[in-house]
């Protein structure tokens, strides 16, 4: 049986690129490609899949109404999926215990957990603030992978 460490091992395979799927209002699936990493939840310490979404996108609306997502990562023919309930923390989605400074650092933590690097984190922070970026956490209630893993 797969676990979140199987998911984590694939992050370096393609810069943390994943396909994240949510449910639209009409029950159909909405999928897109984003970067994700595995890290401790900022409040509970639980190991979660973290992503950063630009403020105002439809996917955030989906997660506000139906807080559940599926995230699939792959490297070559190896893949793993994590699915579960979601939490949001951002300027439009306040989370108790996460103030503006903690959010700034949290967005960096997710970025680096996804394999990201940056030469100018002041600029990174400014862009994240201007775009009203939101941290998205998927609690891996179910993790599965291909048999070759």
Briefly describe each language-model feature range:
Residues 1-19:
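Short, basic/aromatic recognition patches
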Residues 2, 77-149:
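Charged, gly/pro-rich active-site loop segments
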Residues 10-11, 63, 110, 138:
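A generic structural signal for nonpolar/aromatic side chains embedded in well-ordered alpha-helices
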Residues 7, 42-44, 118:
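General secondary-structure edge motif
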Residues 13-14, 65-66, 130-132:
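Structured helix-beta-strand junction loops
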């Amino acid at each position: 049986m797969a676990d979140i460490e199987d998911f984590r091992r694939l992050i370096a395979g393609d810069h943390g690129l994943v396909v994240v799927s949510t449910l639209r209002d009409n029950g159909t699936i909405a999928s897109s490609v984003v970067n994700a990493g595995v890290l401790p939840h900022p409040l509970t310490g639980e190991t979660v899949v973290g992503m950063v979404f630009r403020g105002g996108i439809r996917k955030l609306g989906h997660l506000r109404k139906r807080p559940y997502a599926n995230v699939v990562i792959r490297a070559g023919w190896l893949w793993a999926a994590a699915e579960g309930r979601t939490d949001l923390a951002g300027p439009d989605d306040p989370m108790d215990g996460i103030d503006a400074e903690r959010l700034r650092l949290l967005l960096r933590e997710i970025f680096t957990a996804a394999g990201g690097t940056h030469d100018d984190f002041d600029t990174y922070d400014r862009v994240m603030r201007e775009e009203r970026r939101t941290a998205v956490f998927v609690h891996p209630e179910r993790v599965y992978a291909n048999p070759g893993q």
